[in-house]
Amino acid sequence: MKKEKRQRLIKQFVKEYEIDKQERLVELLAKKDVLVTQATVSRDIRELNLTKVPSQEGLMIYKVFSEEHLQTDIKLKKKLREVVVKIDCVDQLMVIKTLPGNAHVIGVLFDELDWKEKIGCICGNDTCLIISQSKSDREIIEERLNLII
């Protein structure tokens, strides 16, 4: 089977199922008579820019992101690593302290991502307040950020 078709199947599986392990993709592909190794699936995941995000049940599962969403995610990762000084959390609130003059950029990137767990952000010069509906939603955001930083 051609690589493009295999990768199309992988994207389809990731959209239809909560895939938390590469071995699960190997199994699903085998059911479609596509025999591949875990190493091949790993390369496909990298090429497809699949990202692991927390599911509702707390598992880290693969997700397909649009190119635009992916670019915002990459920008956020880069900026967070460059400017974040400290992150504090309480209940449904997350406070991100940044180097002076950088909080607004972090807020804009968060808004572009449009994460459903985030109600909104309020940013000043060096502080960005991320507001979630609940503590569990804030924990999902915190988990994503910990993977990034």
From Swiss-Prot:
NCBIfam families: argR_whole. GO terms for cellular component: cytoplasm; transcription regulator complex. InterPro entries: Arg_repress (IPR001669), Arg_repress_C (IPR020899), Arg_repress_C_sf (IPR036251), Arg_repress_DNA-bd (IPR020900), WH-like_DNA-bd_sf (IPR036388), WH_DNA-bd_sf (IPR036390). GO terms for molecular function: arginine binding; cis-regulatory region sequence-specific DNA binding; DNA-binding transcription factor activity. SUPFAM superfamilies: C-terminal domain of arginine repressor, Winged helix' DNA-binding domain. This is Arginine regulator. GO terms for biological process: arginine catabolic process to ornithine; protein complex oligomerization; regulation of arginine biosynthetic process; regulation of arginine metabolic process. Belongs to the ArgR family. Keywords: Arginine metabolism, Cytoplasm, DNA-binding, Transcription, Transcription regulation. Regulates the transcription of the arc operon, involved in arginine catabolism. PANTHER family: ARGININE REPRESSOR. Pathway: Amino-acid degradation; L-arginine degradation via ADI pathway. It is found in: Cytoplasm. The keyword Zinc does not apply. The keyword Signal does not apply.
